[in-house]
Amino acid sequence: MDIEAEPSLRSIVNHESLKWIFVGGKGGVGKTTTSSSISIQLALHNPNKKYLLISTDPAHNLSDAFNQKFGKDARQVEGLPNLSCMEIDPDSTLENLQKNNESTFGSAGGNDPLKSMMGDITGSIPGIDEAFSFMEVLKHIGETKENQIKYDTVIFDTAPTGHTLRFLQLPSTLEKLLGKVNELSGRFGPMLNNLLGSQGGQSIDFASKIKEIQVQVTEVNKQFQDPELTTFVCVCISEFLSLYETERLIQELMSYNMDVNSIVINQLLFSDDSECRRCNARWRMQKKYLDQMDELYEDYHLVKMPLLAMEVRGLENLKKFSKYLIEPYNSETDGHVVFDLEEQ
């Protein structure tokens, strides 16, 4: 690119059509703070739109970040009416599915072949927990009875990099899986319906149900590869391992044809004239990797965020911090923010 990319996420906040925003990176680099900050800026700049921030990280830090309890159902952020949050628990989602299977298939004791078959399926597919978490997400962003979309944009606070990549494979994985199940249901669906009926279960049209899910997943897969609808924001710190992980993540995202052109670099010291020798040494180390990133990602939006004296917790503190995603931080004029946050 001939024009240097602005060192902010303003293009994301002002984007009119984005429906999916993923935020991910190595563990411990500030993904939750960044995803929360992006969500807040979106909500503040676009008050007529509705946003949903979802944690797919088993650690679930959204409740801690906002100082408000969130769970598996979307809940509005107190003080920000057009932003809601939810925390998806993959293990819990899978357990609920298995319980639903029991109620649907009935119970014929420990040797029930249908229960055994479902157990084998749910236990043998890699990433099955993320798969059903993803289906849970689709339920929450669907249309209401009045045919109005519940949320304009969904922001994902993802698990550490490996889990993120597995989550992003889900649309194509589910598409292949559902195609196979659809094939089997055509051969065995009537037999299963009869068997379920004889066990007291409800008759189910397997083929139509699978087709319904398959259409939905195929559509989402297309949206993930459309830069007008989906983008990924990488989060890192200025250290070797984090830089290496970020490059690996970007290459993987490109292989999925997913748009990625923004990197948030957290925990920067911005100082080499302090009396703190340790701080100066660390800044010199950070500066070395920052220079590498400036060269390697010259056409990316590189957003450089300061290391603060306190944790960024609570809506008001997140608002203060998040504005530097839009207005680039200047250590000479904005240095006070490092100590300005209120203790939570």
From Swiss-Prot:
GO CC, alphabetical: GET complex; Golgi apparatus
Binding site residues for Zn(2+): 276, 279
InterPro entries: Anion-transp_ATPase-like_dom, ATPase_ArsA/GET3, ATPase_ArsA/GET3_euk, P-loop_NTPase
Any one GO biological process: tail-anchored membrane protein insertion into ER membrane
Enzyme Commission numbers on file: 3.6.-.-
Positions of the catalytic residues: 57
A molecular-function term among this protein's GO annotations: ATP binding
Top-level taxon of the source organism: Eukaryota
Keywords of this entry: ATP-binding, Cytoplasm, Endoplasmic reticulum, Golgi apparatus, Hydrolase, Metal-binding, Nucleotide-binding, Transport, Zinc
Pfam families: ArsA_ATPase
Cellular localisation: Cytoplasm; Endoplasmic reticulum; Golgi apparatus
Ligand binding (ATP): 26-33, 239, 266
Biological role stated in the UniProt entry: ATPase required for the post-translational delivery of tail-anchored (TA) proteins to the endoplasmic reticulum. Recognizes and selectively binds the transmembrane domain of TA proteins in the cytosol. This complex then targets to the endoplasmic reticulum by membrane-bound receptors GET1 and GET2, where the tail-anchored protein is released for insertion. This process is regulated by ATP binding and hydrolysis. ATP binding drives the homodimer towards the closed dimer state, facilitating recognition of newly synthesized TA membrane proteins. ATP hydrolysis is required for insertion.
Assembly: Homodimer. Component of the Golgi to ER traffic (GET) complex, which is composed of GET1, GET2 and GET3. Within the complex, GET1 and GET2 form a heterotetramer which is stabilized by phosphatidylinositol binding and which binds to the GET3 homodimer. Interacts with the chloride channel protein GEF1.
Family: Belongs to the arsA ATPase family.
NCBIfam families tied to this protein: GET3_arsA_TRC40
Protein name: ATPase GET3
Annotated source species: Komagataella phaffii (strain GS115 / ATCC 20864) (Yeast)
Gene: GET3
